[in-house]
Structures are given as C-alpha cells and as structure tokens.
Amino acid sequence: MTPKFLWLVALVALYIPPIQSLNCVYLDDSILENVKLLGSTMTGFPLRCLKDITDFKFPKEILPYIQHMKREINAVSYRISSLALTIFNLKGSIPPVTEEHWERIRSGLFKQVRQAQECFMDEEKENREHPHSEDFLTVYLELGKYFFRIKKFLINKKYSFCAWKIVTVEIRRCFIIFSKSRKLLKMISESPTFKQELK
C-alpha cells in the first residue's frame, strides 16, 4: 500500500464515526420522530382543556450543565427517555388519540429508550475510569423531580383526556429542548477550539 493511499485511508477514518456511535445517531432520529408523533396529538386542542394547563417547571437551570456534558449527555438521554416512557405506560389512562395511535407513540418511545440505553452503555464502556460529575447528579435529580410533577398531575386529574393532552404537549416540549441541547453540544464539541481544550 503506497504512502499516498495510506494517507487517504487515515483521512477518511478521521471523519467516519466509530461503529458504537451509530446508536447515538439513531437516537437523534428517534427523538425527532417522537416529537412528530407527539405533535400529531396536538391538533384540535379542546377549549375545555385550557383551564387545566399547568406549568410543570421544566428545570431550565440544568441546560448550561447539559451543554457541557460531553461524556455524560447520553446518560441524560437515557434518563429522559426512560422517564417519558414510564409516564406513557401508566395504567387507567384515557388517551387523547385512538388506541392504535397511542400504541405507535409508546412503541416509538420504547425504541428511543432502547437506543438511548445502547448509546449510554457504549459511553460507559469507554469511560469506566471516570465517575459521574456533580453536575450530572444535579441534572439527574432535577429531571426526576420534573417528571414526578407530570406524573402527580396525571394522578390528580385521574388520567383524564385533558390531562393527557397537556402532558403530551409538555413532554414534546421537553424533547424539543433536549434535542436542541444535544445539537448545540455536538456543534461545540466539533469546533476546533473545543478539541484544543480537550488536549
């Protein structure tokens, strides 16, 4: 193999992500697919549901932490995905869409959780010697409190049609915020300045 050919192989390899990162690529696609699925339930929002709209206090203070979590962003992805799936698996619900559509949403979330878990496990294998940071623990706890407020709202409203309409909109909003944070982190991590700081 000539030196020139070796140089080309090295250059191509530099821009091809490792195989394990494919789980994370698929995860980004799944999040966007679920944003669309959840958005499809927003058509025809009943006026009678407006009185039940609640501020679930999404913890915006965690966003600066997330935007700097190069090594832990996938653990946060798994946390959000699994908590969202737990909400949509609650029993005794009155879904705001047809049962078939509801199953599509749950199936989409299950796929997102599975991919988030695989992505997270890939990351853990690579960083076994690095314990989770205090920032990660803060994000982990705040997300737990946020989804608990959503669950409590559903319970108090007896899983009503309006409650589910509102919760679906909220979780979609959460996914959009998080998806933007992932994209921003990716842009930052791929910048020459960031790479230089890691050296």
Swiss-Prot record:
Residues 1-21 form the signal peptide. GO terms for molecular function: cytokine activity; cytokine receptor binding. Keywords: Antiviral defense, Cytokine, Disulfide bond, Secreted, Signal. It is found in: Secreted. The keyword Disulfide bond applies. Disulfide bonds join C24-C119, C49-C162. SUPFAM superfamilies: 4-helical cytokines (SSF47266). Expressed at low levels in peritoneal macrophages. One of its GO terms (biological process) is defense response to virus. Its main location: secreted. It comes from the Eukaryota. SMART domains: IFabd. Induction: Upon exposure to double-stranded RNA and interferon-gamma. One of its GO terms (cellular component) is extracellular space. May play a role in the regulation of immune cell function. Transgenic mice overexpressing IFNK in the pancreas, develop insulin-dependent (type I) diabete. Belongs to the alpha/beta interferon family. This is Interferon kappa. It comes from Mus musculus (Mouse). The gene is Ifnk.
